[in-house]
């Protein structure tokens, strides 16, 4: 039977036999009939190929392909067998379930059983595996690389050994060093750089100062004081009232016309006479003759008596001013008096000198009542000198600055805004600036604009907006009481000036009603005002009514506390005992008091 099969195969595959003729066919029939061993079979198979030398490789590949196919068939059959076994196990497990009756009703139909399983898994929840977790092991694919691919694979895997190329019996320099080493050698061959410490740069040309910087330097620079010798300081302290510091009035000491100025001021005010000058000179001679003399501290009774005498002198001065107002009505005389009177205000940077006590001298002067916004210049008296000294050194009193008061007001305004959160319409209108923050009745639209308060930064209407003079210098350097009352009552002073002044025609009984305490407070308020010369650069700004009231209350309270603190400090200084020394100019050393010592 094998012979017949081989004969049929030879007819199919022997396509060259027809050309050779009947002789070849007879030879093949003989060879087929004469198959005895495997060698004959191999010869017949090799005869099928065009070249017999390729027969081993060709039939090896055929055998490998057949073997791979049989292995695939074997694995496929084993998978089918294992799947059947798994299905049988699943059927046995599902017989005890509730769904076994449903499967029996469906008569074990495959599609129905699979559908029920899918629905059950969907109800219970199915966890799908990712594609990467799947174990997919395909069969190895056989391929043959081209010579180029084989060479590239060897280069990638570095399966090679390079031979060094010799030039004249030595390796060329290009192959000795890498590119990085060549660059480093080139850098090293260059001349060395100079170190940074040895370099000398040209000085930068001075930049010209701008106008803004020059103005700021002028503002920050302190007022230059004229130098005064210690001899003149001691002589002036013996002549003038000892409670007043020399730094508050330098014009009476440094100039040679100082006795003349003192005499003129005393003639205008009717206070000092030639007798006071003689007493002052005799006291100076006694002080120079005696080296040191211990002064006894005054008792409380003496202090009370001196205060009562000062109050009586104030009563007399006010009564004389109301009784004879025609003395100052002459404008020429007023101009002369104001020209001869020394200014009361001096900057805080001036340093007061140590005080020395002398028996109090009574002075009677004619005073004129003026509104609070008009600056009053008077000759230096004992009480005014004390207030000026205390203005430079406020004792036991916290003076708030304009910046601090502005911050406090803004915080209070924010807290006041939070009260209207329950009223959403009012709150949103106030927050967006569409409603007046003071009266809360005037709404702003496209035609009615709002004014912004420069103190609390809130929009207000025209009726709630007032004018106020605020300093253009940094707020942190100015105390709050420097804003008033000339800054607060600027509009009121204009309206008062239009009305006829009735202060000169007041009866004596109306003046007597004022207490001495109120007069002293008003006088100290006038003394604490900023002079008009320093308020010229202040600009008029828009401030709301609430902020203006808030500022006025703070100013009044701060001034009241400042007056009380100064009064306590003055009484404390009166009860202290100290030495009066007449040392030479070389031994003289003026003592300075700091804020912490006070």
UniProtKB/Swiss-Prot annotation:
Compositional bias (Polar residues): 248-289
InterPro entries xref list: KIND_dom (IPR011019), Spir-1_FYVE-rel_dom (IPR029905), Spire (IPR029901), Znf_FYVE_PHD (IPR011011)
Tissue: Expressed in the developing nervous system and in the adult brain, specifically the Purkinje cells of the cerebellum, in neuronal cells in the CA1, CA2 and CA3 fields of the hippocampus and granular layer of the dentate gyrus. Detected in oocytes.
Residues in KIND domain copies: 1-73
Superkingdom: Eukaryota
PROSITE patterns: KIND (PS51377)
CDD domains: FYVE_SPIR1, WH2_Spire1-2_r3, WH2_Spire1_r2-like, WH2_Spire1_r4, WH2_Spire_1-2_r1
Protein's cellular compartments: Cytoplasm, Cytoskeleton; Cytoplasm, Cytosol; Cleavage furrow; Cytoplasm, Perinuclear region
Ranges of Acidic residues composition bias in the record: 15-26
Region (Disordered): 1-30, 194-213, 248-327, 341-379, 488-508
Mode of membrane association: Peripheral membrane protein
Extent of Basic and acidic residues compositional bias: 354-370
Chain positions with Phosphothreonine modification: 351
Ranges where the WH2 domain occurs: 147-165, 211-228
GO molecular function: actin binding
A GO biological-process term: establishment of meiotic spindle localization
Bias kind Low complexity: ranges: 316-327
Pfam families per record: KIND (PF16474)
Residues found modified as Phosphoserine: 229, 247, 305-306, 308, 520, 524, 577
Region (Spir-box), start-end ranges: 398-418
Record family assignment: Belongs to the spire family.
Quaternary assembly: Interacts with FMN2.
Protein name: Protein spire homolog 1
């Amino acid at each position: 039977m094998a012979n017949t099969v081989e004969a049929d195969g030879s007819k199919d595959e022997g396509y060259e036999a027809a050309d050779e003729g009947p002789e070849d066919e007879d030879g093949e029939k003989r060879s087929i009939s004469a198959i005895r061993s495997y060698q004959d079979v191999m010869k017949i198979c090799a005869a099928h190929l065009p070249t017999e030398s390729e027969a081993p490789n060709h039939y090896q590949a055929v055998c490998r392909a057949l073997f791979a196919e049989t292995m695939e068939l074997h694995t496929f059959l084993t998978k089918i067998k294992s799947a059947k076994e798994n299905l049988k196990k699943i059927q046995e497990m599902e017989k005890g379930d509730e769904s076994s009756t449903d499967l029996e009703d469906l008569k074990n139909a495959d599609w129905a059983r699979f559908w029920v399983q899918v629905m059950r898994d969907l109800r219970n929840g199915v966890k799908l595996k990712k594609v990467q977790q799947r174990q997919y092991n395909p069969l190895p694919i056989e391929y043959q690389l081209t010579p180029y691919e084989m060479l590239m694979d060897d280069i990638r895997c570095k399966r090679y050994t390079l031979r060094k190329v010799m030039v004249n019996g030595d390796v060329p320099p290009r192959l000795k060093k890498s590119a990085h080493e060549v660059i480093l050698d080139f850098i090293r061959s260059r001349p060395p750089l100079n170190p940074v410490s040895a370099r000398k740069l040209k000085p930068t040309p001075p930049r010209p100062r701008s106008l803004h910087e020059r103005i700021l330097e002028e503002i920050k620079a302190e007022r230059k004081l004229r130098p005064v010798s210690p001899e003149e300081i001691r002589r002036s302290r013996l002549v003038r009232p000892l409670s007043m510091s020399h730094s508050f009035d330098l014009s009476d000491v440094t100039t040679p016309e100082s006795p003349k100025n003192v005499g003129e001021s005393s003639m205008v005010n009717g206070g000092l006479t030639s007798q006071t000058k003689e007493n002052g000179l005799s006291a100076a001679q006694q002080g120079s003759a005696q080296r040191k003399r211990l002064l006894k501290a005054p008792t409380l009774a003496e202090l009370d008596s001196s205060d009562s005498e000062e109050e009586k002198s104030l009563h007399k001065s006010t009564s004389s001013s109301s009784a004879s107002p025609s003395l100052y009505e002459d404008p020429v005389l007023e101009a002369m008096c104001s020209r001869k009177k020394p200014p009361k205000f001096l900057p805080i940077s001036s340093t007061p000198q140590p005080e020395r006590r002398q028996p109090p001298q009574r002075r009677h002067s004619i005073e004129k009542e003026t509104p609070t916004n008009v600056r009053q210049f008077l000759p230096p008296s004992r009480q005014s000198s004390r207030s000026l000294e205390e203005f430079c050194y406020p004792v036991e009193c916290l003076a708030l600055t304009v910046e601090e008061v502005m911050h406090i007001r803004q915080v209070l305004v924010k807290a006041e805004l939070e009260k209207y959160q329950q009223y959403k319409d009012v709150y949103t209108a106030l927050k967006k600036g569409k409603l007046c923050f003071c009266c809360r009745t005037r709404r702003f639209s496209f035609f009615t604009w709002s004014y912004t308060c420069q103190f609390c930064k809130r929009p207000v209407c025209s009726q709630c907006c007032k004018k106020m003079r605020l300093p253009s210098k940094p707020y942190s350097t100015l105390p709050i009481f420097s804003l008033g009352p000339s800054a607060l009552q600027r509009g009121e002073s204009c309206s008062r000036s239009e009305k006829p002044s009735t202060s000169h025609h007041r009866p004596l009984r109306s003046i007597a009603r004022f207490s001495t305490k109120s007069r002293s407070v008003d006088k100290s308020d006038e003394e604490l005002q900023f002079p008009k010369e320093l308020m010229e650069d202040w600009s008029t700004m828009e401030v709301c009514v609430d902020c203006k009231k808030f500022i006025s209350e703070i100013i009044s309270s701060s001034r009241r506390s400042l007056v009380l603190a100064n009064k306590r400090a003055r009484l404390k200084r009166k009860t202290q005992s100290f030495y009066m020394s007449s040392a030479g100019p070389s031994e003289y050393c003026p003592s300075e008091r700091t804020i912490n010592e006070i």
